[in-house]
Amino acid sequence: MPYTHPDDNNLKNLHKAMQYSDSQEPELRVNIGEGIDISGTVNIPGNLTIDNFPAIQPVSGTVSVDSLPEPVSIDDNGGSITVDGTIQIAPGSYNSTGNLDNSVDAFGRLRISDMYTLFDSSLRYDDNPFKWDTALSGTGAINHLLNESSMQMSTTGAGSVIRQSKTVFSYQPGKSLLSLTTFAMGTPTAGVTKRAGYYGAENGIFFELDGTNIKIVKRSSITGSVVDTGITQPFWNVDKLDGTGPSGIDLNEDRAQIFWCDIEWLGVGSVRTGFVINGQFITCHIFHHANTETGVYMTTASLPVRYELISTGAASSMKQICSSVISEGGYVNRSRTRSVSTPLTGKALSDVTYTPLVSIKLKNNRLDSVVVPSKFDLFGLQQAAYKYQLILNPILTNPNWSSLNNLSDVDYDISATGLSGGIVIDEGIFVGSNKGGSIAVSQTDVDFSQQLGRTIAGVSDIFCLAAIATTNNDDAVGSLTWQEHS
């Protein structure tokens, strides 16, 4: 039988002084009314609260805190805190590998809803020729897979297939640019190279399957020549996706994948790359440049989306599926507005065929510019009905292309005498009278749907405003306005 002192004041109502810890171990609450001298080291595993302000809490010697999971705040409850000596507050932890938190964008901002889609593409019914251009060589071929909403790219021997977006996408300094590209590359084959990503012929970031070698590649032309820096899977600096990385996942390169990269270009920023697997962004490799390079790491971040299949002789195939390019943190329209018009004396129109009034295209040496038609104006010089059309890529008769000025990205024509072919993207009616009118090509402040594109071979789109009259040789005046995004 245990020894008890039922009349001992120190032991009466002992249960009232007891409490249990989080691990259900008994603890004794005590109230210390006088000072305690402590020598040596005292480890306090939980929280220590000092709340008897405005009393003085003297501390001598050194107080060391190994780690703090939350920000530290000091509340003096309206009094004052006096500190003698030096306080050293260590900076937040620095990860030399880079920004590994995929809940934030390339600049460390929390990924929230303020994202502006610059481009998206799916292939539900066809090869989407308004958005994509194709270049074939040798045995290269494409085939639309209706039931898979995909494009099959294939070779039966030596040959190649390139699928590239007709437009490049406007990068704004200080905003993260996120690219997502989906594909199925199939079985790795010797002598066959397969690529997909955010890149063009001279610059960009992409995933590559070179035979059986898996790479993430940075392409740059800053030296005047194209240089590919390919990082093979064993040398990825975050998650090698070989089962040993933070995710524990093995990359199945022959299966359908979502490749992503986000770019903080600014000429010298970092580029994060990886895959989206099981709904999670997994960072595989980060290209760092600030504090390392002597200049920019690639010429521009305004680039196209591109897929490639190249074979030196083997039969091969891969599938292009979907892609998207997003400006994270929104997009602010800081474009330059430019316009050109016919002479005020007007241009004689036919009553049978459409006559081009104003046409624009990208300059041959500025094919990576972002140019978006925004509005047009029409005025008939006779009291009669007229019709207009906006035509993409007509064949113009006797055009005389001129540069608006040295700063503009556009050449224009107001001299062509006729046109044929092309795709009508809008049409309507206007009436000759004592006043004209403006018509918007796009209905929002920032709308890239009518952006001028170019082919892989370097041929610009032509955007043409044309009109037809009720009576032959009736005259009309026209002007075309566009935005140039740097």
Task: Enumerate the predicted regions with their spans.
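Localized edge beta-strand/strand-to-loop motifs within extracellular or lumenal beta-rich domains
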Residues: 254-270
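Broad, structure-driven detector of short, well-ordered beta-strand segments within folded domains
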Residues: 13-17, 205-212, 263
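C-terminal interaction-tip segments
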Residues: 189-211, 280-283, 459, 467-486
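Extended, low-complexity segments enriched in Ser/Thr/Gly and acidic residues that occur primarily
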Residues: 1-134, 332-385, 428, 433
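Short, aromatic/His-centered strand-loop micro-motif at the edge of beta-sheets
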Residues: 225-258
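Beta-rich globular "head" domains
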Residues: 171-185, 329-469, 477-485
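Conserved aromatic beta-strand anchor motif in extracellular beta-sandwich/beta-rich domains
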Residues: 273-275, 390
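Low-complexity, Ser/Thr/Pro/Gly-rich disordered linker/stalk regions
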Residues: 90-219, 224, 231-237, 288-353, ...
